Amino acid sequence: MLVLFETSVGYAIFKVLNEKKLQEVDSLWKEFETPEKANKIVKLKHFEKFQDTAEALAAFTALMEGKINKQLKKVLKKIVKEAHEPLAVADAKLGGVIKEKLNLSCIHSPVVNELMRGIRSQMDGLIPGVEPREMAAMCLGLAHSLSRYRLKFSADKVDTMIVQAISLLDDLDKELNNYIMRCREWYGWHFPELGKIISDNLTYCKCLQKVGDRKNYASASLSEFLSEEVEAEVKAAAEISMGTEVSEEDICNILHLCTQVIEISEYRTQLYEYLQNRMMAIAPNVTVMVGELVGARLIAHAGSLLNLAKHAASTVQILGAEKALFRALKSRRDTPKYGLIYHASLVGQSSPKHKGKISRMLAAKTVLAIRYDAFGEDSSSAMGIENRAKLEARLRILEDRGIRKISGTGKALAKAEKYEHKSEVKTYDPSGDSTLPTCSKKRKIEEVDKEDEITEKKAKKAKIKIKAEVEEEMEEEEAEEEQVVEEEPTVKKKKKKDKKKHIKEEPLSEEEPCTSTAVPSPEKKKKKKKKKDAED
């Protein structure tokens, strides 16, 4: 049986001298305790040395992918086919490929693994012609080359640093929040007014660290942290504070906590700058599109930049909202429109009704930027700047469209003005000068009811005036009737009635708004005939 053993220096093919020893797997390691014992079990048959590290890297990358290198193929055809013996290999996948392409029987079992372990332990004694120093140097060079190839290593492109930095930044924010809240509550017993005057947490801790006890504010100078007005307000509040007195030991512990808050805040600022620089080095286009914090959170959520590049735009859009998505799918409701991408500046500055559209468009352009950063050779951010400008223009159009609808200018812009030739003669419309009331179009019921009420009130007032005038005329006519002969009373009374009717009809005709003449009804005609007959 032959054994294929791969080293950093070259391929080695050993021949097993005593196969009976291989049956005892548990005690096989004893046969490789010394080089002399190892030479009794296996013997080197052929050694194919690599010329340089590049050739060794190509050979090992092919082995990891389960492929046969040209150099290995030549060795196997030359040595193993002539021997007509089975070949022991360390990788079962490689054995299957050798059997398929070269028609050689390959063996892979726990015995073979133990045999490989023994050969590796006595490699210097089993492979003559290779110095230990050369073997170690070749081993180290191949290890570095192989790691660089597998990890796609670059000094500037290590997204693991981004994942750890953004996670640490979130943890620092939580810790700072807890520490500052505890500090304000703790010192609030001694000087509660200070928390209302100074809203900035870092300034609050710096003032507290410099002054300490409330009594020292009168003589302390806080111009480094506060303006003159705020400083005067703090000193005035310290004199009339309603806080309790505390011991020096309590003040010391509070000051230690303030020191921790200030140090963590400074480290957080430094870490944020580091994250900005690292994001611009690894994913400049993504940073331009969504910002360094959102981009770093997307990379951390996916695990790496390469994993994020494999996601579709629809997945990137809702990345971070998985719970809401599955809850919506379970309850058959509307799925969420955005996840972590909601915190991007483009989505934040858009109106609520346009956030869904902008997040969808931003996700599509962000995926292009991610793939460009992950697989592209160019490290510039030109593509991200161009796509961001397009999205900003699109957002501006959407926002302007909504403003035009509200103001009513959209219709005016949509309709083109009617073309009028210079030779056309414009005529004057005299109907605009008419002062006569005209019948308007159909109006609303509420307006008609209001106008009816107004006309009724006017009609009542007119009737009251008419009655007063009629009564005066009646009194005058009665005085005249006393002087007239008794034969004519009936005729005069009828004339009085006609006058009353005539006076009542005149104001009513003035109140009618329409210009059309009223047609007399048949009942009125009959009454007029009767009056004429009576006069005759």
Curated annotation (Swiss-Prot):
It comes from Mus musculus. Its main location: nucleus. One of its GO terms (biological process) is snoRNA localization. Core component of box C/D small nucleolar ribonucleoprotein (snoRNP) particles; the core proteins SNU13, NOP56, NOP58 and FBL or FBLL1 assemble stepwise onto the snoRNA. Interacts with NOLC1/Nopp140. Interacts with NOPCHAP1, NUFIP1, RUVBL1 and RUVBL2; NOPCHAP1 bridges the association of NOP58 with RUVBL1:RUVBL2 and NUFIP1. Interacts with PIH1D1. Part of the small subunit (SSU) processome, composed of more than 70 proteins and the RNA chaperone small nucleolar RNA (snoRNA) U3. There is a cross-link at K467 (Glycyl lysine isopeptide (Lys-Gly) (interchain with G-Cter in SUMO1)). Disulfide bonds: none annotated. InterPro entries: Nop56/Nop58 (IPR045056), NOP58/56_N (IPR012974), Nop_C (IPR042239), Nop_dom (IPR002687), Nop_dom_sf (IPR036070), NOSIC (IPR012976). There is a cross-link at K467, K504 (Glycyl lysine isopeptide (Lys-Gly) (interchain with G-Cter in SUMO)). This is Nucleolar protein 58.
